[in-house]
Amino acid sequence: MGAASAVFADAVTVVSWGGSYGKAQDAALFTDASKNSGIAINRESGASMSKVMLQVESGAVTWDLVVSGSGSCAAAAAAGALEKIDFDVVDVSNFLPNTYTDYCVGSDVFATVFAWNTDKYGEPGSPGAPNSWADFWDVEKFPGTRSYRSNNVDGALEPAVMAMGVPPEKVYEFLSTEDGIRKAIDKIRELKPHISVFWESGAMQAQLMKDAEVDMITGWNGRFDNAKKDGARVGYTFNGALRDYDGFGIPKGAPNRDLAMKFLGEVSKPEYQANLPFHITYGPTNKEAYEITTASKELLEALPSHPKNVGKMLAVEIDWYAKNRELALELYMELLSE
């Protein structure tokens, strides 16, 4: 937790997610940034850009700085629900390409991967182990239960398109029409009888694998690495994974807008980001963090932002989400309610 709000007159309400991700941010970023900047923070969980949009619409904004996936952030920005970033206050001059926009500043690079029970299918890279989205869909070659995303369309359609055999560089072109979006959803519909659990959060992804409740699952690489540390028999591949970033947005009309912008500037500095890989295997967005981190070569090579992994992945296209997310989400929710 940040410094108690009683110490300072103002406190920035920072909203992230729970589980190992929120703990990693507290340990690497928030606690020290609050202490060093003198800006108190109130930490809340349950971050959601849908909630941000509702707060902005109702004129009752209570959050100041909200963590979000890049696609949700782009959709909220397109809806006019976010403040423009003041780049005089938030220095992104050393950030990796495509890890910030005018409304969202990247905090970490992560990957949406598919993971599996290694007792059932073998260690990653071993003969016969799954290695592609086509394998995730192939219930004859890899019989067993699946788990897929339930409450959001971010990262849900692209795997289905790649499972159809569309090359990664053509995925967003395929999804640029309603027909393409519907075909992707039909592909997920095909798998639905084998999906025994739909997950709702990163904490749930980790728990499902710790409990060996499902055999194969989509989710975020860092959650699976932390589950493995906790004893889960889990492995994954970066092949065809979606390279994405989480970022911070400031809701339009945030009660402590200026202070939130200052805190965002502080937390984006390399000295905080350099600590993140020790707590979760997500890569810093600030290039300087890689120069000053004391992380081992082995740990750095496990990050989605490492050059040896980047080429295997599909970079998430933020513009596609800004234009198509609303329709894609509506159609995906229809599928889930069938």
Predicted features by range, described:
Residues 95, 110, 182-191, 228-254:
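Periplasmic-binding protein-like
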Residues 10-76, 206:
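Early extracytoplasmic/lumenal segment of secretory-pathway proteins
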Residues 251-312:
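Mature extracytoplasmic/periplasmic domains
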Residues 73-75, 216-233:
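A ligand-binding cleft/hinge motif common to bilobed small-molecule-binding domains
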Residues 19-24, 62-63, 67-204:
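Extracytoplasmic ligand-binding site segments that recognize negatively charged/polar headgroups
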Residues 63-67, 198, 215-220, 235:
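Paired acidic/hydrophobic, glycine-rich loop segments that form the ligand-binding mouth/hinge
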Residues 308-338:
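Conserved C-terminal helix/tail region of periplasmic/extracytoplasmic solute-binding proteins
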